[in-house]
Amino acid sequence: MDKSLIREIKCIINEIEEHDYISKVKYVIFLICKELYNSKNEYPVKNPSIFKEYSNFDLKDKKAEKRIEEFTGINEGNIKVSSFYPASLYESLLTGKEKKSLGQVYTPFEIIDKMLCEVFAIKKIDGSVRILDPSCGGGYFLIELYKYISSTHPELDKRYIAENMLFGIDIDDFSIFLSKIGLIFHTGLDNIKFNIYKGDFLIDNINMDKFDIIIGNPPYVGHKNSSASYKRLLYEKYSGVFYDKADVFYCFFNKGKEELKTDGIIAFITSRYFMEALYAEGLRSFIKENFNIVKIIDYK
């Protein structure tokens, strides 16, 4: 989105009173997405539940609603909905400090594209392939997966791809919203039956069949930033890889193996320190014993 539009959105955010900055950012993005969705004729049967489901972001500020309605009306031609990433707007409105406090680091598109090319050079795409992003965040991987599959395999129905091949999990309500509305915008489809769930991939029992591909950017949550109760749960479930000062993302390899088909593939972008860290010896052994390593790319 153009920087001048970002500045205008920030002005609207700052005009809202009595709420913390992050809540105001979520609210304004919620309103912008709602206006863009309702203003487009591409969706013959609209699905208002996508917004009702996330009404907890609605601060009910009439002045802000009016300002966003005017903003989207004036700038409708400058915002191409079919290529609009709500998560990218969210990212651009947060400072580095806020991103760090939220623990949300989005993956650059060029790295996502590289990962998809590497995975699909190995794994053939057909209608039976099931792909999971276990910490889907703003939906970047899911959207890029949809775009890649639909463009390289036009014989596959677009709705079928979105509803039967793509799966996501995240612990954050707003991330789920960003993933869903982002897919709606990029698919041009209405009333999608999503397989995107709120939950903790590591500890929640989300009943799904096993996957052909598990791909994504697991959260980097250091030992000091995890609660004692949460660490106890991880110590019990993933004692082989999670101990002492291990990072939470180590557990994603272990859980990923459990949810993967026998001939499945895991592709993660992670911090590189697990390759050398003292407390990652268990993870290195786990990977060596349980996976055939195809490639490690170090972006150092």
Descriptions of predicted regions:
Residues K123, Y160, G188-L189, N195, ...:
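A generic structural signal for short, solvent-exposed coil/turn residues
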